[in-house]
Amino acid sequence: MNVHVEVVCITADGTEQRREVLGIERAELAMETLGLSLQEGKALLKGVQDWVVAQQVNENLERQRVCKHCGRRHSTKDAGSTPVKTVFGRVEVPNPRWHRCTCETTGARTFRPTKAWLQGRTSPELLHLETSGLRRSLSPKWRTC
């Protein structure tokens, strides 16, 4: 038996983009082959997380690519990425640097379009879980000794 897990992203304009995130093959049914292994489950989650992050960021970048003042596209200075820690592990977030449009005469010559929302390198949900876990571990009722 072959199983293929695919993620489908439907953009605002109705375009579908597909990506296979996991493919597994099972020959015989046995306790060892029942369901997903831990490794397969982690690979599935990582594949979905990476794809969703890439689609979200790329759609956001595409909306910002055109200069608000004159309509020309911002050219790329460099195409970097930033590692971000999430509840499900580390992901690489596209974080390009673009040249400011020639119609803009003030400010730096380059900018990062993700600056408005890419604050820090840890997701708020992970920070919340880490701090609530720390509070619990320091609380007298959670101490074991």
PLM features: residue spans?
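Short, positively charged, Gly/Tyr-enriched micro-motifs
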Residues: 90-145
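Short, conserved DNA-binding cores of transcription-related domains
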Residues: 1-102
